[in-house]
Amino acid sequence: MYKLFGKWDLTEVEVADAGIKRYVNLDPVIVPHTSGKHARQQFNKSDITIVERLVNNVMRNAQNTGKKQIALRIVDEAFDIVNSKTKKNPVQVLVEAVSNAGPREEVVRLKYGGISVPKAVDTAPQRRVDHALRNISIGSNQTAFKSKRSAAECLASELIAASNRDAKCFSINRKDGKERVAKAAR
């Protein structure tokens, strides 16, 4: 059986949120690197493991653009830190963080006679996963910028805080803000 980075077993990870279960891929791989095979089809990003999608989002930062080996190392070190702090499988912590950090409602603008009116709509499950991963990586990048803490430490603390639904966490804060605006627009 393959273990992620030679350490973490993906078969013991369970997705509790039924809405995103189809979009969180937990196929066993050693190194999460598919070389962009999903890029030709619109919704094929769901076929990539959730860890590689996190790696790709970490790689989006300005100084890390295109440096997948650096992003893989950051995620690997962050998973080690998560395991040492929580004594849980870090992929399980990642899945819990994604399910907690994905917004369930957002706002669209509708035009009625030249006037734009905000309307609350449910968020698609794949979009929930995308926003959660993006906000987790943005939060860790902002925390690590001009800080003595490493990017791996910041990513680990963001994952742990998001899995615990900590309101101080960037991704949970961003999710709550979106849902608050949507609630006002009902």
From Swiss-Prot:
CDD domains recorded: uS7_Eukaryote
Any one of the GO CC terms: small ribosomal subunit
InterPro entries for the chain: Ribosomal_uS7, Ribosomal_uS7_arc, Ribosomal_uS7_CS, Ribosomal_uS7_dom, Ribosomal_uS7_dom_sf, Ribosomal_uS7_euk/arc
SUPFAM superfamilies to which the protein is assigned, alphabetical: Ribosomal protein S7
An individual GO BP term: translation
Keyword rRNA-binding on entry: yes
Keyword annotations of the record: Ribonucleoprotein, Ribosomal protein, RNA-binding, rRNA-binding
GO MF assignments: rRNA binding; structural constituent of ribosome
Family matches, as PANTHER family: RIBOSOMAL PROTEIN S7
Reported function: One of the primary rRNA binding proteins, it binds directly to 16S rRNA where it nucleates assembly of the head domain of the 30S subunit. Is located at the subunit interface close to the decoding center.
HAMAP family for this protein: Ribosomal_uS7_A
Oligomer and partners: Part of the 30S ribosomal subunit.
Family: Belongs to the universal ribosomal protein uS7 family.
Protein name per its UniProtKB record: Small ribosomal subunit protein uS7
Natural source organism: Methanococcoides burtonii (strain DSM 6242 / NBRC 107633 / OCM 468 / ACE-M)
Gene name in the database record: rps7
